[in-house]
From Swiss-Prot:
This is Chlorophyllide reductase 35.5 kDa chain. CDD domains: BchX. The gene is bchX. The keyword 4Fe-4S applies. Belongs to the NifH/BchL/ChlL family. It catalyses: 3-deacetyl-3-vinylbacteriochlorophyllide a + 2 oxidized [2Fe-2S]-[ferredoxin] + ADP + phosphate = chlorophyllide a + 2 reduced [2Fe-2S]-[ferredoxin] + ATP + H2O + H(+); bacteriochlorophyllide a + 2 oxidized [2Fe-2S]-[ferredoxin] + ADP + phosphate = 3-acetyl-3-devinylchlorophyllide a + 2 reduced [2Fe-2S]-[ferredoxin] + ATP + H2O + H(+); 3-deacetyl-3-(1-hydroxyethyl)bacteriochlorophyllide a + 2 oxidized [2Fe-2S]-[ferredoxin] + ADP + phosphate = 3-devinyl-3-(1-hydroxyethyl)chlorophyllide a + 2 reduced [2Fe-2S]-[ferredoxin] + ATP + H2O + H(+). Pfam families: Fer4_NifH. The lineage of its organism: Bacteria, Pseudomonadati, Pseudomonadota, Alphaproteobacteria, Rhodobacterales. [4Fe-4S] cluster binds at residues 130, 165. Binds 1 [4Fe-4S] cluster per dimer. InterPro entries: BchX, NifH/chlL_CS, NifH/frxC, P-loop_NTPase. Residues 1-17 have a biased composition (Basic and acidic residues).
Amino acid sequence: MTDAPELKAFDQRLRDEAAEEPTLEVPQGEPKKKTQVIAIYGKGGIGKSFTLANLSYMMAQIGKRVLLIGCDPKSDTTSLLFGGKACPTIIETSARKKLAGEEVQIGDVCFKRDGVFAMELGGPEVGRGCGGRGIIHGFELLEKLGFHDWDFDYVLLDFLGDVVCGGFGLPIARDMAQKVILVGSNDLQSLYVTNNVCSAVEYFRKLGGNVGVAGLVINKDDGTGEAKAFAEAADIPILATIPADEDLRRKSANYQIVGIPGTQWGPLFEGLAHAVGEAPPIRPKPLSQDGLLDLFTPEAIGADFKLEPATDADMRGKNAAAKKSLEVIYDDA
């Protein structure tokens, strides 16, 4: 069975659009209200979605208007907020509506729970497009929906921090956010990502940008102290420390919100909500690779390992026969 001709034409149009340079512009006019747009970065699996779902819920409970936007192609930012139910993404909905000749409406892509508004930008299927370009396209669609006229106290953007693609760095590169929040833990890989984001912030500050780092949320804290040492070395504040606790792990796995006033974990997330709102954007001091490694004990990172250079013979293996020389050797006269 072959695709209908109109589907092939539609597929080609999408490919043509993906090949175009992004045209998203940062608005120059004065906003109607001072909304804090905050981008959250961290290593995949470090707990950004858990942190953001509970943070946004607590913000709403203390009277703030909050919009949570998932900017990760996995589209799992809002799952915890909505009890494990997946939202239709903006990218997916836009493609479907466009094929049907319809316009995307707010109710197609934005959903709410107890005062929190949330949506997912989404991204291409695996192997079928650029995730960063999908983020850019998603923000262009948000502008068409009236993003800059919306009335919120906070807009929280959940970004993947493991990649260096410009699309995922959009809030930093184009001053779309006022500040960045980092989520990390006491392990080298998560701090490597947070340090990379600090480097990106500092790079664009040197180019005249205004985005700064508000601070670090230490998640799954086991008390070993590496994340705290990183924050001190990078000169950024710690906004909250979330312990490695079995109750938190179990409730997160069951899609339960814990950032509720009057509960065991309520004070933790209420404190985080206030800290996020009040923390100023500052210029971080990114660490060098050696500086980052120095935060850990030699045993933890294999610092006593020595690099052994490979040789041409190593690479050739069984084919490492002696090369015939074309050099002409003359007998002694």
